[in-house]
């Protein structure tokens, strides 16, 4: 049901001058007891970042927001420079100056759609939106015998610290689908996903439902890959 709320916002192009598009049914998300809203996506689509931006707009109507994006914490100074630049050209230059990461290798988190999301968030901030944009991938050490499940715990700790730093804000996170899930997948070596480590009464996890199409993915090679048709 909740996943359909995201899917409902994917139908038309966005122009910042037209303002934010309403997301039908999003009022169900803004309960007083919900501190975290996690949006799980398949990286590399056009639609998910656009819908997430609309959801951020809706959240800002309710109060201050922390926007947590799936970039490494080392990327935070670049995010800050992008958001604070005087002009869009300077913002783009700050992003291009980062020596590695998704906007150099262009995986699904460094797509034109994600750049459009960052530009929309920047525009909201320039309109005095009560919002902070933060990176959400911790620098977890790679230690033999300690699998991805430990990185998931680190990610949950980082989210909680971001929330505690601004206790009157709601945290909205856009992450890969698995990190937003609240139970362990059957047979998965991942262990508990990051969102499952946070008190469930304070969290809502959404999953973007796609009706087919493709996503830009980088595995052995980068390119378009089909994504499953999900009945929202």
Regions found by a protein language model. Give the residues of each.
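Sec-dependent signal peptide recognition
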Residues: 1-8
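Compositional signal for N-terminal targeting/processing segments
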Residues: 9-232
């Amino acid at each position: 049901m909740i996943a359909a709320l995201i899917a409902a916002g994917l139908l038309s192009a966005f122009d910042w001058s037209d303002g934010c598009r309403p997301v039908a049914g999003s009022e169900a998300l803004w309960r007083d007891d919900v501190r975290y809203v996690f949006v799980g996506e398949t990286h590399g689509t056009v639609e998910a970042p656009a819908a997430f931006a609309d959801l951020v707009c809706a959240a800002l109507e309710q109060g201050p927001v922390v926007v947590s994006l799936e970039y490494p914490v080392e990327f935070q100074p670049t995010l800050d420079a992008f958001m604070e630049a005087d002009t869009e050209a300077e913002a783009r230059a700050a992003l291009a100056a980062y020596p590695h990461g998704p906007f150099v290798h262009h995986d699904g988190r460094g797509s034109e759609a994600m750049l459009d999301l960052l530009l929309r968030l920047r525009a909201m901030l320039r309109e005095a939106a009560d919002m902070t944009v933060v990176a959400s991938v911790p620098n977890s050490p790679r230690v033999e015998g300690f699998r991805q499940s430990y990185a998931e715990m680190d990610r949950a700790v980082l989210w909680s610290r971001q929330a505690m730093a601004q206790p009157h804000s709601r945290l909205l996170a856009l992450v890969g689908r698995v990190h937003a899930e609240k139970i362990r997948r059957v047979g998965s070596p991942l262990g508990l996903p990051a969102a499952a480590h946070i008190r469930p009464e304070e969290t809502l996890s959404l999953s973007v439902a796609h009706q087919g199409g493709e996503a830009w993915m980088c595995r052995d090679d980068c390119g378009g890959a089909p994504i499953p048709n999900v009945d929202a």
